Amino acid sequence: MVSGFVSDKNKTKAVQYKLSGHNSSALSSETVPAGQTECRENYGQMPHAMLKNTAQAEKYRAKPLTSQQTQTTMNTEANRKTEWVVGIGEALWDILPEGRKIGGAPANFAYHMSQFGLRSCAVSAVGDDEAGRELRNQLREKGVGHMLETVPFPTGTVEVTLDGAGIPSYEIRQGVAWDNIPFTPQIEELARHTRAACFGSLAQRSPVSHRTIGRFLETMPDGEGQYKVFDINLRQHFYTQQVVEESLRKCNILKINDEELAVVGSMFGLEGMQPGEQCRTLLDRYGLRIVILTCGAAGSSVFAPDTRSYIPTPRVEVADTVGAGDSFTASFLAALLSGLGIGEAHRLAVDVAAHVCSQHGAMPRLPERFTARLRNDGPAIR
């Protein structure tokens, strides 16, 4: 899914969001028995394929851990104190012209976090269907930790159509699994050990997932080193002022693009202000640590109480822009977690997002020149 980072601002107008004719009133909180959900090992049922700080995990890093290996590793006292980076919300299939690829902003975020060597996890829900089973398999193959609950709804899909410049339009199916993410004891335990989480507005279109995301954020520990990133991702009519305001009060970092900022500005009486002034107002009003504003070809800015960073958008040959914004968010946060400053984090995020725009799909493998920038400093929760 695109989250607002495109290489040509004038082309952002071409991005359209269409709905299929599914009835959203059919959403339900009913779930299948817990035993049918993946990752039911001891100690909080933490996800497998994510363990990176023990000798045993290092041995198996090149391939997914089995349930027995996960259970053994998770039972150590060191791992009971492990901190995770979590993307919570939609995990789905983007149906692209060249075939289907894993998508959903939180899943994309978790994938890119894992490329920087952090213990990341995608929290979502899938159906008891072929698409859900294959989504799990693909995440395993990509080395992405995941806690995907099985629910009696179809696995989410999005029909993606690309124009001649690689700018996508979407048909987002409703009444799907990620609309119904339950807040299980396993997800609650994961939240207690999460240092940074990224969430958006799209998965909050349904009351079930809205409640789960809210409870997850409330369960996370508080502290100066905790990050709750609201990557707003406004999609068609799948948001309300109430959801946006609640999310602004729960996060400490906001990521937004220029078109979304215009919508939010209208919501909260910020019309007539310059974009920078709008960002500063949101920063102050909601006590945020950072506001990230992306403006397509016009560049991007990062605002903090005593800092502003601006970087122009690099020129690249665009393959498609799917997932570029998610890679921006992940790279920026990974850099902060590794101890880099805002300017350095911003530079990495811009470079990674530009690279993702030059590739097909939301989850390309990042070159060593990007991932090595953080390995030299050592991410704090690797």
Locate predicted features.
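Structural alpha-helical scaffold elements that stabilize or flank donor/cofactor-binding regions
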Residues: 189-190, 246-247, 284
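Conserved beta-alpha-beta core of the PfkB/ribokinase-like small-molecule kinase fold
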Residues: 196, 201-281, 299
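Conserved phosphate-binding/catalytic region of the ribokinase-like
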Residues: 59, 66, 70-83, 268, ...
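Extreme N-terminal basic, low-complexity initiation segments
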Residues: 2-17
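Targeting/processing segments of secretory and organellar proteins
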Residues: 19-22, 26-28, 42-47, 52, ...
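Glycine-rich phosphate/adenosyl-contacting loop at the front of the ribokinase-like
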Residues: 59, 66, 75-144, 158, ...
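Conserved N-terminal subdomain of the carbohydrate kinase-like
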Residues: 119-201, 224-225, 373-382
